[in-house]
Each structure stands twice: as C-alpha cells, then as structure tokens.
Amino acid sequence: HIGVMPKSETTKLLVEQAVSQLSAPVALRELSDIYHCNRALLITDPKLYLAGVAAPVVDQLRHQGIRVAEYFTIGETVSYEDLRGALPKLNEFQPDVILGVGGENALSAAKALLALYVDSELDLTAAADDSHLIPACDKAKLVLIAADCTSGAQTSPFAVLKDDEGEIRVLKSIYLLPELSITDADFTQWLTAEGIK
C-alpha cells in the first residue's frame, strides 16, 4: 500500500521548496552601488510575507548596508485605510527607497505611498480623477518586484485602490512609474495553478 499525499499538502510542500530556493535579484545591488540608498521601506502582502517570498530581498538589502523597515498589513485590494496605517512608519523611517514586492495590491500600495510620502494630505479620490494632483517624489526611489504573473503592475503607471466606501479608484501618473522594475522568474515559482487563474 502506497500512501498518497493530499493535494493541499503537495501544493504546500512545492511552495515551501520554491521559496527556500529564492535568491534576491542581482539588480538590487544598484540601490547601494549606484543610487547610494540607506533606508528601504518594503511593502508586501501578508501571504507573501508569511511565505518568506520577500525575505531574500530583505537579506540582500541588509547585506548591502541598507536599513529595512517592512509593512505588510494590506488587503487583496489595497485600501485607503491600509495606506493610512502605513503612513506613520513611512514618515518616521524616512526611506530613500520604497520597494513593492508582490502582485498588483502590494505594488499599488508602494506607488500610492510614494505619492503620500510627498504629500501625506493628498486627496486620493481627487487625485484619481485628476492625475495632475499626483506629485513627483524626489525623496525616494520606487522599486517594484513582481511576484505574480498576471497584472504587469511592476511596469505600469497605475495604482488600483479601494476607497472608504469600497469603490475602486485608480491613480495614474508618470510619477508612479518605478525607477527600477524587476521581473524575475524565481519570484513566481511559489505560484500554484490555482494562484495563476
């Protein structure tokens, strides 16, 4: 009699193996070598954080002498409330680079926080209607690392947000384009067939 591992356990094992083999993208070296960054705020979602997907990025940054603060309290669609929760850490830590690691929600959060870093009182609903209200940020670089294969958010000027009434709002501005966009196949190995659908 040969035991068969349940599908859920097999999937969990495959995800754990993929995550354990992750290494940080080589392009991250530019943050210290070229941009001379000292403080990074890393934005990801709880699922990726708990799976350890962002850990190689954090390790690489710290190895380069860059201090790292992490924020991962965001929902499936990043909300205004999520962003308000991140503002104290953003303003206290004063990063010179904001990194988003994940899918559209984490990358949208990173983009929106870049705009709020310049103007913490920015009316996001008004900015969604008028892109001219979105300020350019000279306080921090934006780096986006895709950890899914569906949205293309790592190369787009859009941030998809949910307002306080549950309505979807989309920020759009060239100022939300990243300084560095990283698409690394290693960072999608953790995805399951169900996760891609």
Residue ranges and their predicted role:
Residues 16, 118-197:
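A glycine/threonine-rich phosphate-anchoring loop and its flanking beta-alpha core
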Residues 49-122:
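N-terminal small/polar loop signature for handling phosphorylated ligands or for N-terminal nucleophile
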Residues 38, 96-98, 179:
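Conserved acidic residues
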Residues 1-70:
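An N-terminal, well-structured beta->alpha segment
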Residues 41-42, 97-99, 143:
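Conserved beta-strand elements of the Class I
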Residues 34, 56-60, 115, 158-161, ...:
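Short, solvent-exposed amphipathic alpha-helical segments in soluble enzyme
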Residues 12, 62-63, 92, 113, ...:
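N-terminal loops that bind phosphate or other acidic moieties
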